[in-house]
Design a protein with these regions (language model features):
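Noncatalytic, basic helical substrate-engagement surface that gates or grips nucleic-acid strands
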Residues: 1-114, 118-145, 223-239
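Non-catalytic nucleic-acid-binding/docking modules located in mid-to-C-terminal regions
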Residues: 35-38, 127, 142-301
């Protein structure tokens, strides 16, 4: 595992995320051998979500400065490695991924979504799988491939009911409040008994435990709003285009520039290139200028 405190020796620019990002991309490409590979970035803000819930994701901590500094370089490296980059201001990367999956599967392609986000379970089925990364707390578990059975076993409801489930329990990571006191077990039980969110709302007079009935009556419209928030929108423009070619010389130059020497040597060996001599390093002062606004999140697809 790459250390998060790695830095370029000449000016102490952080490179830990770059090391980990490159390793993940290359490992995934080697293990999955896809026909094409796209990476989706958030450019900040989601117009459709904020229109329903102005507090959407408002509780999230600021991205660590070291990560913000590396994001422009992460994007540059991603392109050099031959991965398509997809992003659109005002549209969440999750919606762009769901749109791409919808378009590609409709034309007969198989898709793998690489993400730990449980929301993507609603896309799984038919030609779509979800590949989740190793848990931070237990990396020995490795990457896990989730089909319909896997998603159902993990969440407790099938993919087509995950949005109903999330509308009821809420999503703390996105600042979406569910019904107060309703946890996973209760939501799964209600959905199994009543067939989905609208069935639950319609059965308010017989819902058990009885203490939830008044809350359901008074908050039904808000919970329906939750459903809009957690259901992916799949009608955004998306064109697969041509798969970019890997720029081996460009990657070698990039790794040299970032002083990622061990990664550079491995990459040169992999591509049959002569190893470059290590440059002499003259330390420079670290720039204190504010980093440019860049995407805060990347998802692999």
């Amino acid at each position: 595992m790459e250390r998060s405190n790695l830095r370029r020796q000449s000016d102490q620019f952080p490179t830990g995320a770059l090391h980990g990002w490159m390793k993940s991309l290359l490992d995934l490409r080697e293990s999955e051998k896809p026909d094409r590979f796209a990476v989706f970035f958030d450019l900040g803000g989601s117009d459709r979500h904020l229109a329903v819930l102005p507090e959407y994701k408002a509780q999230r901590d600021e991205t660590p400065e070291d990560i913000v500094l590396q994001l422009p370089e992460i994007k540059r490296l991603t392109g050099l490695l031959g991965f398509q980059i997809v992003e659109k201001r005002g549209v969440e990367a999750d919606d762009l991924i769901a749109t791409a999956v919808h378009r590609l599967t409709a034309s007969g392609h198989e898709c793998i979504i690489v993400s730990a986000d449980k929301d993507f379970g609603q896309c799984v089925g038919g030609k779509v799988l979800q590949l989740t990364p190793p848990p931070t707390a237990n990396p020995a578990l490795g990457w896990r491939r989730m089909d319909v059975a896997g998603v159902t076993a993990k969440i407790g409801v099938p993919p087509e009911r995950i949005a109903d489930y999330l509308a009821l329990v809420g999503d703390a990571s996105d600042n979406i409040p569910g019904l107060r006191g309703v946890g996973p077990k209760t939501a799964v039980k209600w959905i199994a008994e009543h067939g989905g969110l609208e069935g639950v709302l319609a059965a308010v007079e017989s819902i058990q435990p009885e203490r939830f009935r008044e809350q359901i009556r008074t908050e039904a419209d808000r919970i329906r709003g939750n459903l809009k928030l957690v259901t992916f929108q799949t009608d955004f423009p998306f064109e697969p285009g041509d798969q970019p070619a890997e720029d081996v010389d460009g990657v070698i130059d990039f790794l040299g520039e970032m002083e990622m020497h061990s990664t550079l040597r491995r990459y040169q060996v992999k591509h049959g290139r002569k190893e470059s001599p290590l440059p002499s390093v003259v330390p420079k002062a670290v720039s204190k200028s504010s980093p440019p606004a860049e995407p805060r999140q990347g998802e692999l697809f």
